[in-house]
A protein has these predicted regions:
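An N-terminal assembly and electron-transfer interface module characteristic of large anaerobic redox
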Residues: 1-238
């Protein structure tokens, strides 16, 4: 179980969700570190997997192995936050696979959090579980705004700057324990202020998949950027 003084490893989902999750743990006094997002961690993961697992599960395991080794963390006081929910795929098996892969890498004793995303209070302290859920929703909404506006921006880079500013707004709100609704109101104003030309809508393309794929530019091989380059507008279901 998660204990005071543990180092918490945060899976890389995307730039926003992972940063918000890490900051949520930090506000509760934990040392939280986001796993690397690169092809290298995929190679590491596959060295300690059976080969038939979902790519996101392999990426998470590889990221945990690389971070523990590179930062010389003690597995017994390291907690891998790995939320799951019972659904018709291998999602609930991610924690099992991560435990097996890290043990194969010689990192026995790593705490792999089997956290039900819909009932996190059994594992996580206080309101932390609710904050993690809330920030996941906020991050998803920010990306919806971002992908809705970026293809139509009049000034190149305006949506990217707004995305960076939005990240800062939510991180500060977490540190100050401010309500997320108020923070998101300021984020919405940022994107509302971007000048755009959307009189003629582009073809809309939905990107489906679990959250470790549809947002992750390494695992999905930058599919969202490619769609926009080809003249489409991204729709990311939450």
């Amino acid at each position: 179980d998660l204990a005071s003084g543990d180092t918490v490893l945060i899976p890389y989902v995307n730039r926003l969700i992972s940063a918000f999750w890490a900051e949520s743990f930090r506000t509760e006094g934990f040392d939280a570190r986001v796993l690397e997002n690169s092809e290298r961690i995929l190679h590491t993961g596959y060295r300690h997997a059976n080969g038939g697992e979902c790519m996101p599960a392999v990426a998470i395991a590889g990221g945990a192995i690389e971070l523990i080794r590179s930062q010389k963390l003690e597995p017994s006081s390291t907690f891998l936050y790995l939320p799951a929910v019972c659904m018709a795929c291998n999602f609930p098996q991610f924690p099992v696979m991560a435990s097996m892969a890290t043990e194969s890498a010689g990192l026995k004793g790593l705490k792999v959090g089997r956290v039900n995303f819909l009932n996190p209070g059994a594992v996580l302290p206080g309101m932390l579980g609710m904050r993690l859920f809330e920030t996941s929703v906020i991050a998803s909404l920010i990306y919806k705004l971002y992908h809705r506006i970026r293809p139509y921006e009049r000034e190149d880079g305006a949506a990217d700057r707004a995305l960076g500013d939005a990240e800062g707004i939510v991180l500060r709100a977490l540190r100050d324990r401010e309500g997320m609704r108020k923070a998101f109101g300021r984020v919405a104003e940022l994107f509302r202020g971007i000048e755009r030309d959307d009189a003629e809508r582009r073809p809309r393309v939905a990107v489906l998949g679990d959250m470790y794929v549809k947002y992750n530019e390494v695992v999905n091989q930058q599919v969202t950027r490619r769609i926009e380059d080809l003249g489409g507008e991204i729709v990311l279901p939450s």
